[in-house]
Amino acid sequence: MSYNYVVTAQKPTAVNGCVTGHFTSAEDLNLLIAKNTRLEIYVVTAEGLRPVKEVGMYGKIAVMELFRPKGESKDLLFILTAKYNACILEYKQSGESIDIITRAHGNVQDRIGRPSETGIIGIIDPECRMIGLRLYDGLFKVIPLDRDNKELKAFNIRLEELHVIDVKFLYGCQAPTICFVYQDPQGRHVKTYEVSLREKEFNKGPWKQENVEAEASMVIAVPEPFGGAIIIGQESITYHNGDKYLAIAPPIIKQSTIVCHNRVDPNGSRYLLGDMEGRLFMLLLEKEEQMDGTVTLKDLRVELLGETSIAECLTYLDNGVVFVGSRLGDSQLVKLNVDSNEQGSYVVAMETFTNLGPIVDMCVVDLERQGQGQLVTCSGAFKEGSLRIIRNGIGIHEHASIDLPGIKGLWPLRSDPNRETDDTLVLSFVGQTRVLMLNGEEVEETELMGFVDDQQTFFCGNVAHQQLIQITSASVRLVSQEPKALVSEWKEPQGKNISVASCNSSQVVVAVGRALYYLQIHPQELRQISHTEMEHEVACLDITPLGDSNGMSPLCAIGLWTDISARIAKLPSFELLHKEMLGGEIIPRSILMTTFESSHYLLCALGDGALFYFGLNIETGLLSDRKKVTLGTQPTVLRTFRSLSTTNVFACSDRPTVIYSSNHKLVFSNVNLKEVNYMCPLNSDGYPDSLALANNSTLTIGTIDEIQKLHIRTVPLYESPRKICYQEVSQCFGVLSSRIEVQDTSGGTTALRPSASTQALSSSVSSSKLFSSSTAPHETSFGEEVEVHNLLIIDQHTFEVLHAHQFLQNEYALSLVSCKLGKDPNTYFIVGTAMVYPEEAEPKQGRIVVFQYSDGKLQTVAEKEVKGAVYSMVEFNGKLLASINSTVRLYEWTTEKELRTECNHYNNIMALYLKTKGDFILVGDLMRSVLLLAYKPMEGNFEEIARDFNPNWMSAVEILDDDNFLGAENAFNLFVCQKDSAATTDEERQHLQEVGLFHLGEFVNVFCHGSLVMQNLGETSTPTQGSVLFGTVNGMIGLVTSLSESWYNLLLDMQNRLNKVIKSVGKIEHSFWRSFHTERKTEPATGFIDGDLIESFLDISRPKMQEVVANLQYDDGSGMKREATADDLIKVVEELTRIH
């Protein structure tokens, strides 16, 4: 068996739907947003959108509508999922707790029926008498809205019109009436029917209109006084109500297709329309009052307001503010202005909501060589196309920065005895010291009486008896706070320079070469208590008081040169309590005693970025549990700071890290800064609970995030990215992208807008010897859209487009790899293409082009003609493996720099995906699931090892390990196949067994090995192996990792218990939601643990936790089973949350 854990690292971000109404209360205006399986509820306030609650549905939200039945004080929410679970939800708030109550629920799936091509449509009668659903061709399903019905019961009415494009309920009709656009062999027509609840059938409707525009696609029901319906087409907009017919064909709407609409005014006089190019229009209905006082429609008018993100849905909120929900780009809150700006636009973006979808491709890279992966995704499409750089870490929010190079240390001070907060920052430089006064948010340089400024400071701070201390290379200086004056000074008896110092509020230890001196701080006096000689020179010191020692430390931690040791000595006698040899050549640079979660530790950082940490017994001074991690590559400086009343340690280096403890394990979290040399906590009036951070050139003051989270940076391309790969030698990314151009009158094409490929620093164009341009069987006509494909070379630091290489006309770039081939020392970008013509069912020719990028130039090294589309390529043992239409082919790279075919494998329908491990090749097919090949180097050919005989339409594949293979298919499921090497017969061995099945509810475009968290840092007892990330169409990033059998069984038990305790919204069974489901079959999930459900354990109340753990058997690592406590499970789950 194969045991896996699937969890969300980034929830879906693409918006599939949005509605507005009064859901949380009659007074609140709410915006409800559907992001695939997640429902987000906001209140619209004067300040913007305020999040109220986020609900995870056990299903993909297909329909979401607010309605208010008679007798209700606020709106109810109707939701239908893709697996046909329907529910009516109500918002209930009591005190702090918010509940979403399921008023009624049921499944409305038919056992037979062909799901409609135009998807699921759900509509609600304006009088709230019924809900109408168009799920299958030829059927209209009705759910009567009875007040007290807990179960949603539905019945079907036969529809003669099989191919319905869109349907709506009309306003102001005695009986519920539907109006719909349908297609038949003659064209498209509009028809209406009355729905009779009693007879459960249709009656003849009030009007119909035959032969409307051939592209008519949307019905908008218009409220009274007008009534009737508006039909939106590709070129025309028409209004019908039986006795009135109005048509307009504004040229402005022809360029693109209108895809969404929303009513602005309750009386239906204005509508917003959004098209596929991201343009926003206003449709105005002009009225005319008749003699008898009735109102009729006089005219329709369309105005272009401006440009937004490409809208999937629109909803008008209030005061000219519109929410634009987007699937292809970031969603927006926009303001509609009365007057246009210089560009002629009436639209201004107020706020942007990040969307990673659709993630078409991605790669994991460690750009800063920080041992932590960053994910770079190809996100968005058309003008919304972008690269997104995603990394996990603790964010620092910068509030001020000052250019100050060469800082060697910094300390906060309270210069005034009556202050609670810091008002001064002391900065140390080589040979000098500077003092900054903090006045509110203002920072100015000043001088402190009693301080010296012509020496480097080693320590500075507030100490006992309302005094300040400054330790410089020459002396230890004690200064009274009021008035500021030097009251005591200690110098080394021979006047030698101090090399290292440590100080707390009442004690000082300084090192002069090998000698150590211990001083105590008294009123107006520094008193030398003792001194000693060490065997070697002292490299670092610490006397941080631990435990309840009243601010006095009985211990001194010392790091020495030469023998590379860490020692614990007793104060005041300097008696050696423990000596720890650290080994190696690199000296300790920073040593620190600290307490995390009431356990004491000694941390010791070396000059190469390594960190040792030990348990410390403060009674005996003994060290235990030695562990080592690597935090960077440069000397590391350790400083403590407090955040959320817990102690944290900040490790300053080229890879700044925050160290804290969780469940008595140390956790190391990346900080999202390039490098930090020194830091100190700062709590001033203008900068409360902040940190001051110094690097080589700058001093920064900022606040720190409480938790790790994903940080996303956007690099807009304004065109569609398709594939990405990273090339370390040239420090570049290769990106395949495509832009849309339009055929102009001269026969050439022009770009619609400036984008990455048209604005690169340099560019080149393919000229192929292989294809003469006249072979194109297809002539484009004026106004036709053409895709132009490019290879972009993008700098890994600045993300600037350094070069754009344009491919041939009609040539689509499909695959990309960066690799070395054979014995050739060069690294190449290799692109696989296809010549795409509309009249060909599948491409008949393509190319493999080998590029080299060096010294800012892109050169074509070789090209190879192939008879088909190069869907996928990977480097394979120094050769190039490619899938071309149905063939898997291996090329070797000759000394003449040409690709030569070595062997082929033909047994596929369409080989779309390739992954390799050792000599094994996993092939993902369009419809024939996955196949495992082995390359036989001696014979120089492929051998078919095994295949999955289930017909899965693949969207991505990955190799988990030698025997387990992960697949994603087009019905939103994941599965794992296993190679059965131990099988007795050949026939069994040739079957890949499906051992894992799981319904993800997301369309996976890409899998890749890698992780978003620091690897192998600190102790981890997470029983997981490997980490495969995946990116989906909705912008979700997920992770699949493998479990041992015992852990799988524990988590499975926990999952089943959680399902009894956690009530799902809409009363949908978790087992139903996660069951593997295609048009062919439905099977229960197996071999996968739902990590999102397991992690929800941390969010439930303590009594509910107790309910989950009751009688749960747990092995705590001792080999013995015992009953688990809630805290045991909290530990387990917190460990699991750390993998993403």
Swiss-Prot record:
Subcellular location: Cytoplasm; Nucleus
InterPro entries: Beta-prop_RSE1/DDB1/CPSF1_1st, Cleavage/polyA-sp_fac_asu_C, Quinoprotein_ADH-like_sf, RSE1/DDB1/CFT1/CPSF1, WD40/YVTN_repeat-like_dom_sf
UniProt region (WD repeat beta-propeller A), positions on chain: 13-356
The entry's keywords: Acetylation, Biological rhythms, Cytoplasm, DNA damage, DNA repair, DNA-binding, Isopeptide bond, Nucleus, Phosphoprotein, Repeat, Ubl conjugation, Ubl conjugation pathway
Post-translational modification: Phosphorylated by ABL1. Ubiquitinated by CUL4A. Subsequently degraded by ubiquitin-dependent proteolysis.
Modified residues (N6-acetyllysine): 1067
GO biological process, one term: regulation of circadian rhythm
GO cellular component labels: Cul4-RING E3 ubiquitin ligase complex; Cul4A-RING E3 ubiquitin ligase complex; Cul4B-RING E3 ubiquitin ligase complex; cytoplasm; nucleoplasm; nucleus; site of double-strand break
Cross-link Glycyl lysine isopeptide (Lys-Gly) (interchain with G-Cter in SUMO2), sequence positions: 1121
Assembly information from the UniProt record: Component of the UV-DDB complex which includes DDB1 and DDB2; the heterodimer dimerizes to give rise to a heterotetramer when bound to damaged DNA. The UV-DDB complex interacts with monoubiquitinated histone H2A and binds to XPC via the DDB2 subunit. Component of numerous DCX (DDB1-CUL4-X-box) E3 ubiquitin-protein ligase complexes which consist of a core of DDB1, CUL4A or CUL4B and RBX1. DDB1 may recruit specific substrate targeting subunits to the DCX complex.
PANTHER family recorded: DNA REPAIR/RNA PROCESSING CPSF FAMILY
Entry function: Protein, which is both involved in DNA repair and protein ubiquitination, as part of the UV-DDB complex and DCX (DDB1-CUL4-X-box) complexes, respectively. Core component of the UV-DDB complex (UV-damaged DNA-binding protein complex), a complex that recognizes UV-induced DNA damage and recruit proteins of the nucleotide excision repair pathway (the NER pathway) to initiate DNA repair. The UV-DDB complex preferentially binds to cyclobutane pyrimidine dimers (CPD), 6-4 photoproducts (6-4 PP), apurinic sites and short mismatches.
Identification of the protein by name: DNA damage-binding protein 1
UniProt organism field: Bos taurus (Bovine)
Gene name linked to the record: DDB1
